[in-house]
């Protein structure tokens, strides 16, 4: 709902209200939070009284007439507001003040066209402002969606001289009260490290300058009340539909107002706005919940699933993937791929992805990026031949590309060295992963990518694309932004005409996990780190703002290439169940019992896929220190408990399941899991009638053919009992093997299926 009445603007959705008003030509922010009425506007208005003694007055005569103490929807420079400004400009090489005043507004049924991704299905309020002295017009666009609001800005040069934009944010938001800023930063294979910082008088900033949204600083962040929990408390969520360098800041004023800015990074930014030209910012998205972090996550998950990802993939089940990379890397033949395909099909996979190494002379990562012609020595039947053979097995066919990059050792670079991004002063090129970036600001480069990639997609039965990008940019400021606009143009032209293709984006893992890419790609590779212990943290952090339906989650071999850690196959599978399940290891090396375990994982996933991809996600902890993930639909609940290091003599552990009807009966059943005989080592001597060498042939043979039951549990209880906490099967306590106990040791986990007991089943 958008209500405009007597200078008051009220945006309201199913969860929250957003109110502001026109005051003396400025836009005064009134309220963003719990649902309210338009008539409440006067109650929310700031009351500065006699003002503060050091105020710079906008008009002489009233100490309260000072922009520095008011909550504002937008603020300029040099007119008395000394807080951080969302806009910085220069004209003729000199910084200039800005002073935008209200002109009018209109309600639009749909967003105006944009070169940037814009949320789907929103109603728009357009508010028009003007700086008469600078001859500039500013349009603030507000969008209303069922669980979120959006904001962006469009600046138009109405004068006769060029204006240089040094900084132009997407949104300026002001909130009263005390808040903690929750951010998610990190690096390669260490993405999404959750940090909590109190918002104080000192400004807190988080910024990416790499040319991508980056694993260093995810664009999504939260503002939460200090006492907020998973189920209760005020929490705000913010994100940005942008895949380039970005910026956020939060700072509390002496008056108790927290100003939040979000938008394109201003670092080295200088965008020339010619007379008559317009500059548009990326769209910011924000949501509020009074039901804690879980409520806020539900708002954002619904937003992403229903208003962000491509319409053809909204609500569609994601296939179980087998990716060839860790099983083959660059060393493969068609016959080897087909062997892997047969193994993948037998284990329950539905889509075979040929990763790197299929084009040019790509036998290492030092060559051939940009040369997207099939290597016929490896694939004598071409991509079509391979794809048709995989289709005949009952597998879909997917393909990996890295289109934004070029190898210096490639035919493309030798023919068009000017197509790469180079230093503007001609300095020596800096390589990342042995490659350069193509200059996507050039139309001819974009045309080449659209034609070459599009031609391959049309010439073979390809139903999935993994789009990778593996280096940071050396471009600066405005050139970085122009590159992102070029990327979006390429993605639009390739994939909008081919909506049947499932696109998964990737950038050295989670280096570009953002809402801008989700507008094109329904799922994103979370991280190059597939160690489930690390993935548990990464995926939990992602879950605050992104739904599991867009997580690329694969089971890999142990010990893990990123950590050298040994983890159980059960835990690798259990973590990967909560997302878009896939496998990335050499399937031909699996033991028979491992094959059986993977088949059980894929069977469980297919049976509960809708819940695991689209259910309501809740985070929790057990009293035994376990991490709890819960996915719930109206029909069923899937919950998992994950542990770190095994303690000595662990106590009782209780699982609390939320969202059930307290008066109904529910049955909990654990997903069957198995233990390796060899994991017990010399302890086998205490339970067997004969002494066996734990490293000997007998134990190795048993290990390859036999597994022991682990963590089996089944019980029936009321929803009220589940909410209070049901007691789980005991963990290993050093006193023997319990076939009904949980015996995993370090990094163990269990998954539980919970469903209402039908009336005829009740005792």
Give short role names for the model-derived ranges:
Residues 15, 153, 276, 322, ...:
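Conserved, mostly hydrophobic/aromatic
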Residues 146, 154, 162-163, 242-247, ...:
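Extended acidic/polar, glycine-enriched regions
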Residues 646-763:
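C-terminal beta-sandwich/jelly-roll accessory domains of carbohydrate-active enzymes
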Residues 7-14, 27-251, 267, 664-698:
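Polysaccharide-binding surfaces and accessory modules of carbohydrate-active proteins
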Residues 313-451, 462-464:
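Aromatic-lined carbohydrate-binding/catalytic grooves of carbohydrate-active enzymes
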Residues 88, 95-102, 271-290, 746-755:
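Short Pro-Gly-centered flexible turn/kink motifs
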Residues 375-382, 414-570, 577-595:
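Active-site neighborhood of glycoside hydrolase catalytic domains
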Residues 222, 622-663:
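Carbohydrate-binding surface patches
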């Amino acid at each position: 709902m958008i209500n405009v009445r007597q200078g008051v603007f009220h945006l309201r959705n199913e969860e929250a209200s957003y109110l502001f008003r026109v005051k003396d030509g400025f836009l005064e922010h009134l309220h963003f939070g719990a649902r309210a009425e338009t008539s409440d506007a006067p109650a929310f208005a700031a009351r500065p009284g006699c003002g503060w003694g050091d105020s710079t007055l906008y008009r002489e005569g009233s100490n309260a007439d000072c922009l520095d103490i008011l909550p504002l929807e937008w603020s300029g420079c040099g007119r008395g507001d000394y807080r951080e400004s969302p806009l910085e400009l220069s004209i003729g090489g000199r910084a200039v003040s800005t002073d935008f005043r209200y002109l009018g507004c209109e309600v639009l049924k749909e967003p105006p066209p944009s070169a940037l991704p814009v949320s789907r299905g929103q109603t728009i309020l357009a508010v028009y402002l003007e700086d008469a002295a600078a001859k500039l017009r500013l349009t603030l666009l507000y969008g209303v969606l069922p669980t979120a609001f959006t904001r962006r800005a469009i600046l138009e040069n109405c004068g006769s001289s060029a204006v240089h934009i040094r900084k132009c944010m997407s949104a300026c938001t002001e909130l009263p009260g005390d808040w903690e800023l929750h951010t998610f930063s990190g690096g390669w294979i260490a993405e999404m490290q959750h940090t909590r910082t109190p918002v104080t008088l000192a400004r807190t900033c988080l910024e990416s300058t790499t040319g991508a949204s980056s694993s260093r600083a995810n664009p999504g962040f939260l503002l939460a009340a200090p006492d907020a929990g998973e189920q209760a408390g005020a929490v705000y969520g913010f994100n940005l539909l942008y895949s380039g360098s970005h910026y956020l800041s939060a700072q509390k004023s002496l008056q108790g107002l927290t100003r939040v800015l979000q938008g394109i990074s201003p670092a080295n930014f200088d965008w020339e706005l010619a007379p008559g030209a317009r500059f548009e910012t990326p769209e910011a998205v924000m949501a509020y919940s009074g039901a804690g972090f879980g409520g806020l996550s539900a708002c954002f998950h619904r937003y992403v699933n229903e208003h962000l990802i491509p319409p053809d993939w909204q609500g569609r089940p994601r296939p179980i993937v087998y990716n060839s990379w860790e099983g083959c890397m660059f060393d493969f033949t068609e016959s080897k791929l087909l062997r892997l395909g047969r193994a993948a099909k037998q284990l329950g996979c539905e889509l075979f992805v040929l990763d790197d190494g299929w084009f040019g002379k790509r036998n290492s990562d030092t060559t051939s990026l940009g040369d997207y012609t099939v290597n016929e020595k490896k694939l004598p039947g071409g991509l079509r031949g391979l794809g048709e053979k995989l289709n005949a097995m009952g597998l879909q066919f997917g393909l990996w590309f890295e289109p934004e990059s070029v190898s210096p050792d490639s035919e493309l670079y030798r023919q068009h060295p000017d197509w790469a991004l180079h230093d503007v002063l001609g300095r020596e090129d800096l390589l990342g992963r042995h490659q350069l970036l193509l200059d996507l600001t050039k139309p001819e480069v974009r045309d080449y990518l659209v034609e070459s990639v599009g031609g391959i997609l049309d010439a073979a039965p390809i139903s999935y694309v993994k789009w990778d990008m593996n280096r940071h940019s050396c471009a600066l400021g405005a050139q970085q932004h122009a590159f992102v606009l070029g990327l979006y143009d390429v993605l639009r032209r390739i994939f909008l005409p081919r909506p049947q293709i499932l696109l998964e984006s990737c950038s050295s893992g989670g280096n570009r996990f953002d809402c801008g890419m989700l507008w094109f790609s329904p799922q994103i590779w979370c991280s190059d780190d597939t160690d489930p212990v690390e993935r548990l943290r990464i995926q939990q952090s992602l879950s605050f703002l992104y739904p599991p339906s867009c997580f690329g989650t694969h089971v890999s071999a142990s010990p893990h290439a990123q950590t050298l850690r040994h983890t159980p196959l059960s835990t690798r599978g259990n973590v990967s169940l909560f997302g878009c399940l896939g496998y990335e290891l050499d399937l031909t090396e699996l033991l028979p019992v491992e094959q059986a375990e993977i088949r059980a994982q894929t069977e469980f996933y297919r049976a509960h896929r809708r819940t695991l991809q689209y259910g309501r996600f809740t985070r929790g902890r057990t009293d035994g220190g376990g991490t709890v993930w819960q996915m719930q639909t109206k029909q069923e609940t899937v919950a998992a408990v994950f542990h770190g290091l095994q303690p000595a003599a662990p106590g009782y552990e209780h699982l609390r399941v939320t969202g059930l009807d307290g008066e109904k009966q529910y049955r909990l059943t654990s997903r069957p899991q198995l233990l390796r005989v060899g994991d017990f080592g010399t302890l086998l001597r205490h339970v067997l009638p004969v002494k066996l060498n734990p490293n000997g042939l007998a134990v190795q043979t048993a290990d390859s053919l036999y597994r022991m039951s682990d963590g089996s549990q089944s019980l029936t209880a009321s929803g009220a009992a589940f909410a209070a906490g049901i007691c789980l099967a005991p963990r290993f306590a050093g006193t023997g093997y319990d076939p009904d106990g949980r015996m995993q040791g370090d990094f163990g986990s269990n998954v539980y299926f919970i469903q209402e007991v039908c009336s005829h089943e009740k005792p």
